[in-house]
Amino acid sequence: MKIFNRKLKITSSALLTLCMVFVMTACAENSSQSEKSQPAEQTTVQPTTMSAEEINDRKLDKFISDMTLEEKVGQMFFVRCPDEDAVQQVSEYNIGGYILFGRDFDGKTKDEVVDDIHSYQNEADIPLLIGVDEEGGTVVRVSSNPNLRETPFLSPKDTYADGGWDAVKQDAEEKADLLLSLGINVNLAPVCDMTSDEYGFMYDRSFSSDVDMENRYVRTVVETSKSKKLGTVLKHFPGYGNNSDTHTGIAYDDRDYSEFENTDFKPFYQGIESGADCILVSHNIVNCMDGEYPASLSQKVHDILRNEFKFDGVIMTDDLIMDAITDFTGDEAAAVTAAKCGNDLLCCSSVDTQYPEVLEAVQNGEISKAQVDASVKRILKWKQNLGVFNIDTYQKKVKSTEPTDTVGSEE
């Protein structure tokens, strides 16, 4: 009887163990099937957040791709405003802007100047840069007219001598307010050249021969102007020093590169750091950089700005009609050579002859279309920064095809 009970206990225990194994196996299979029936976890790809600058770049790229080649080439011209047909020239060449000189202000009232500039802007499809040289002292295109300012602006040197840095800042503010009130959005200043020769070409226009003083002057002018949304132009890269006037012929500079690094370059670095959007390149030949071409026509000089200075703003020429350039290339070829070496804006007085030459050079591949696109993008960005051009509200103007009445025509 004890043996039977013992066997029964063993058998019951075995059955219990077998049942437990069966249940555990079934649960494992169900769990496995359940896992197989569940969809695999999906990795959610978060959309890449683009910066405002990247978004704007894409908008500009699209805008430029929709422009005609003729429109793009026109944007590269910063033209001396002609005596006649100034309004017609705006739409005929789709120019990037006008530079005004003393003759555009002489004897005019403020309202007359404002009306003139408004007529140019009203004709432009893409709003214009309207520039002027209002340095103070010997270069005062606007304030030399007593209808526009009671007295001309003093030179930077005299301004500082009269009132120190507060006076320099106030002077920059007053210039910005006056120019903007007329419709001018770019002042071709400050002068970054440093000269110690009182008989030198740039002496009266230069602020100081001391690097620290010149740097502070450039910073004050650029930052003050930028706060008002007045464009500035750092000039004349790479620095005239004590050289002669290139309006009357080519000037040669034999200084060592180290001298430029230690002196002349520094105000331009300061201007870039302070937010300047444009640099004007001079016509002097600087042998340590390029002994063959004037700086404005030198690929090597432009490479210094792009690669060493890391400057990605607008590079513009000095006036291509100056003797230093016309003696070197001839009038028609100057703009083509200037564009090929990397200038974005071509400052000229004869757009009617220069524009067709540049357009043809792009059409035949002498100047790449990609380079033109890059230049136009820099120009449009500058216009955006000045509040002149708004890509989000831009609407292309529809030009009238109706024939205009001709004075003296028969009815």
Task: Label every model-predicted segment.
Residues 278-281, 285-290, 304-411:
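Active-site or pore-adjacent capping/gating segments
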Residues 88-214, 236, 241-254, 282-297, ...:
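Enzymes and membrane/adaptor proteins characterized by extended Gly/Ser/Thr/Asp/Glu-rich
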Residues 217-236, 259, 263-276:
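Phosphate/pyrophosphate-binding betaalpha-module
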Residues 28-29, 35-130, 134-144, 410-411:
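N-terminal hydrophobic targeting/anchoring segments and the immediately downstream early-domain regions
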Residues 23-26:
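C-terminal motif of bacterial Sec signal peptides marking the signal peptidase cleavage site
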